[in-house]
Amino acid sequence: MENVNPPILEVEKVTKYFGGLAAVKDVSFEVRQGQIFGFIGPNGAGKTTLFSMIAGALKPSSGRIRSLGRDITGLKPFKLIKSGIARTHQIVRPFREMRVLENVQVAVHFGKNPITSATAAKERAMQALRSAGIDQLANDPASILSVGHQKRLEIARALATDPDLLLCDEICGGLTHSETSDMLQLLRRIRDSGTTVMYVEHDVKAITSVCDRIMVLNYGRKLAEGTPEHIQSDPAVIEAYLGTRAPGKS
Amino acid sequence: MTLVDFTSLVVSALLLAGIYAVMSVGMTVIYGVMKIVNLAHAGFMMLGAYFALELFERFHIDPILAAFLTFPVMFLIGGAVHWVLVRKLPHSDEPTLPSLLLMFGLWLVLQNLGYLIWGNTDRSIFTPRTLSVVNLGPISISTVRLVVFVAALVCLGLLQAVLHYTWFGRSVRALIQNRRAALIVGVYEDRTAGIAFGLGIGFAGLAGGLLGSLYSFDPDFGRAFLIRAFVIIVLGGLESISGVAIGALVLALVETFSILFVPAGYQLAISFGLLALVLIVLPGGIASLLAKARRLA
Amino acid sequence: MNASSVVIAGQRVARWRSALPWALLAALALSPLLISSPNLVRLLFTTFLWVTTSIAWNLLGGFAGQVSFGFAVFYGMGAYTTALLMNAGVNPYPAFLASAVTAALVSLVVGLPAFRLRGPYFAIATIGISEAVRVVMTNLGFTGGASGYRIVEHRPFRQLEHYYTALLLAAIAFAISALVAHAKFGLGLQAIRQDEDAAADVGVNPYTYKLAVHGLAAGLTGVAGGVFARYAAFIHPGGVFGFHTSVHILLMPVIGGIGTVWGPVLGGFVFGIVEEEIVASFPQVHLLIYGSLLILIILFEPGGILGGARKLFRRFRGKR
């Protein structure tokens, strides 16, 4: 059934120059609601730059970014939250002097549907922690968490802002094999509960196993876009990134 | 305004820029290597001025020479301060609050030492040179200003030479540009930082000694210059000598020409107005542009 | 000790803690009536003003992590606003309110450019702005310039009225600080202090939040300046706008325990009392003392007196 709503994310000919070098050149794509959309690419392909532009950390040199029809190009992160776009960080950035619950509580207070009362916010924060599977750590100082738990905290915190679109920056970085598959399960649950996920990742296996659609970047340009099967069998992609025959999902 | 007047002002500004530059490099080196904003810089400038004064009054050493003599003394003091205090601060890639407050506390201590040793009356270094004037064509320049300017250029030149042609200088530049990478390739952070700190304090003392020939001073001396050093650093960038030179030039020009419109008492307010303007036009100043670049990670 | 007795002990501690501010307030409110000593009243009056500015500074510097060396600007603006208005016939209490408003407006003028800078750069900018204001006020004619300004109040001087005004102000400041600490506003400030960019990534607008807390802190400090001006009846730029005033305001919360609710109160009391003693006996070393104290605190106990006391208390409890 064709989704006729405006796409949750519409990136149109976005370009970013650093000095004379184009880190990202004329990249266009759409993310429809209810998907897990991933993008991959070799080192230097411009993934981080593109992600940063969508997340509001960088302004594009040219091009437009839209969400649900509204222009969000160059908006600052706190404004993007109000537009329903939240992000996680590749290198985790918890509020180290707060407890886990307080970390998420902040997000609840300032998210898209902000809650002012501290008690109500705490409730909502516990819910977010439960969705991320770390509610048992609620009273622990955020600084002592393991990497896997800190990544989940990033997700819980981002989810607590009630986003329509969740931007995940290499959320599986530094995780063990089983932690990775748990994390991917979490992403699927998030998608199934109605939040679209846009996912940047290095780990090709992770991306191909969880995403509904994948875009491949190379040298700052879009190389290919399609379903995981399509991408894995695309000769240009194989040549540029995967090298030899793509490992199948099985 | 005649051409002669205009040129006079430009020359005046140029001379001032030299002073401002040498005053700011001390802070820049320490900031660049250790990301510490050295508020005690003012205190060390003050010590330099008094030290030069003492050498001049007790041993009749030429004040400019005395200023250069303060360098090794202050260098050692700087090294000692680093060893005892600064080394205990946690390392960071960004300036931290504790380092700021530590240096501020040190500044208070230095001020008080100044008051205890020299009292609170204004002092100045007065030589025949102070009143004499050099004539370059139709323009007359105060001799002492010219001499100080030349001394400042010599200092800056020496610093550039050290930074670019010695092993130590390369370590310093490496730490400034990328601390972690520098550590990986084997730069000894503590030792280099200690030497860099000593260098920064040495230059503070030297600058103070030179300034002492130009202005009268008391133990609170240095606060106005500290603020100017900061304006220069924000204007010109924090991590290069040429940036400091640019910032110093801009500030000196603004201050010198502002005398035409505004009474001299308001000079400091002008410097700050300039900073405010820069911050509004170039939001965040140059410092936070650098922070934005770092944010990409 | 089993689980339930620990919980009960915890509740007992909690009840103590919430009763403490009220007990203290009652004690301070009653003391001038019980102990008749004008000196003590004067000392406490000054201390209350210090506590107020200490709490105010801590809102910005402790909670939000923005260290300002320029709070003398607000203190001085408050002092001069009250002074000028009172001499124009205005009642002191509306004048105090006007002081709060003036100080808050000035904080906007300071904050709009200054908060574009981060951390230490902001701090240094505040030094400069503070100095620039002092220079301007020293040169201004209608405020008496460098020689100062006198307030003429056509009412009898009642020391107790000043005392209770200052106590009320300090109590209000404390209440604001305690309420803010655990509410949305306070959490937002803490988030900004701990990681400004991550705070923005979860929806906090750091710039407006900093401006808001700056205004609140400035307003409180301005009223303190106004209350002081009325009491002293004579103010001059070197005093109320002086750099040393900014230094003292900053020192108190750092000494007492930066970033906590009680720390600034502790720091204010310690400072008020110690300052009186030191200024009396050893005026020439007080910068040395404060500077060394600052260095020692930074290197050995960044949590100030409160932090040190907590550590000792925990060690004591552990030994049982």
Task: Locate predicted features.
Chain C
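Membrane-interfacial amphipathic/re-entrant helices at transmembrane-helix boundaries
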Residues: M1-T52, T81, A88-G89, Y93-A95, ...
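Generic structural signal for small/hydrophobic residues in well-ordered secondary structure
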Residues: L44, S68, T81, S107, ...
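Extracellular/periplasmic helix-loop junction at the C-terminal end of a transmembrane helix
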Residues: T126-Q159, T165, G186, P283, ...
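Alpha-helical transmembrane segments of multi-pass integral membrane proteins
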Residues: A27, S31-I35, L108, P156-I192, ...
